[in-house]
Curated annotation (Swiss-Prot):
Gene3D superfamilies the record matches: HUPs
Record keyword Phosphoprotein present: no
Similarity-based family: Belongs to the class-I aminoacyl-tRNA synthetase family. GluQ subfamily.
Pfam families listed in its UniProt record: tRNA-synt_1c
Any Gene Ontology CC annotation: cytosol
EC supergroup of this enzyme: ligase
Name listed for the protein in its UniProt record: Glutamyl-Q tRNA(Asp) synthetase
Lineage, broadest ranks: Bacteria, Pseudomonadati, Pseudomonadota, Betaproteobacteria, Burkholderiales
């Protein structure tokens, strides 16, 4: 079956590409902090500059990491900050049938296979210094052990089958970071779409949900830049619309680590929303001086447009 003949069931049908639709997609692993606010603000401003729609999607399918009540706390913080989505928020955990349907489509075109390897076995199979050094976000480069069969092992996970050599190279133009290229076979190998614990991998879930919601533009942190080629590859396999990407610099702590709950990020102070917004804008290269939130947003939208113009004429 050719890629052009792929048809999704209605549950995973992609909305047609049209006017700008962006989104902020936090995971409910803790309260909103300055690092995630930077991404939320950038995505909101980008939607406003382009006269588009801004959505919020709670990416809560990694149930082991979810913090009870964090989703509602994040939404409450966004509302206090004036970042209110144009449509009702969605929860990724409500979309599991979409992901199953996408997996079935990939299996139908022989781009999916079961894997019985453990992480320890994969690590032990990587013996050269060069291979050990080629890790992306602590993702082991899969050597393809189960490509031709499980060899008596029980299936643990499901992996996408990549093409060989240069056919596995994906390039895209990031609106902030510039042209990016990655050879998926060399950088990550056949990557997991459904994990051994039954959880869905981020790569397949975000691709399917973005398409279903008609997302045209993704604005997010540069820590996810490395994931983008995998997502573009899946979009192409599934015949989904292309998405434009903009990856903003991540906020780091004094040790140079990405600011997160694990590295001591503090929750946004909802009693001082203007101060939080001003700090987030500064991380984006925007110096906004305003007496109130209305004045902040009135100044921030044209400031973001000017910031984009400094990056690239096509932004």
């Amino acid at each position: 079956m050719s890629q052009a003949n792929l048809e999704f069931p209605e549950s995973v049908a992609a909305a047609p590409r049209g006017p700008y639709r962006g989104r902020f997609a936090p995971s409910p692993t803790g309260p909103l902090h300055i690092g995630s606010l930077v991404t939320a603000l950038a995505s909101w401003l980008d939607a406003r500059v382009h006269g588009g729609t801004w959505l919020v999607r709670i990416e809560d399918i990694d149930f082991q990491r979810n913090v009870p009540g964090a989703d509602r706390d994040i939404l409450a913080s966004l509302e206090t900050l004036g970042l209110v989505p144009d449509e009702a928020p969605q929860w990724q955990s409500a979309h599991l049938p979409r992901f199953e349907a996408a997996l079935a489509q990939l299996q139908a075109i022989d781009r999916l296979y079961p894997c019985g390897c453990t992480r320890r076995e994969i690590a032990d199979s990587i013996t050269t210094v060069d291979a050990q050094g080629r890790l992306r976000h602590q993702t082991l480069i899969y050597p393809g052990t189960c490509r031709n069969g499980l060899m008596g092992r029980p299936p643990r996970a499901w992996r996408v089958r990549l093409p060989d050599a240069d056919a596995a190279t994906v390039c895209f133009d990031d609106r902030w970071q510039g042209t990016q290229c990655q050879n998926l076979a060399e950088a990550v190998g056949d990557f997991v779409l459904k994990r051994a614990d039954g959880m869905w991998a981020y790569q397949i879930a975000v691709v399917v949900d973005d398409a279903a919601q008609g997302i045209t533009d993704v604005v997010r942190g540069a820590d996810l830049l490395d994931s983008t080629p995998r997502q573009i590859y899946l979009q192409r396999l599934l015949g989904l619309p292309a998405v434009r990407y903009l990856h903003v610099p991540v906020v780091v702590n004094a040790a140079g680590e990405k600011l997160s709950k694990q590295t001591g990020a503090r929750a946004i102070n909802r009693s001082q929303p203007l101060a939080a917004l001003t700090e987030a804008a500064r991380h984006l290269g925007l110096e906004i001086r305003a007496a109130d939130m209305e004045g902040f947003y009135r100044a921030a939208v044209p400031a973001w447009a000017h910031r984009l113009a400094q990056l690239t004429p096509a932004a």
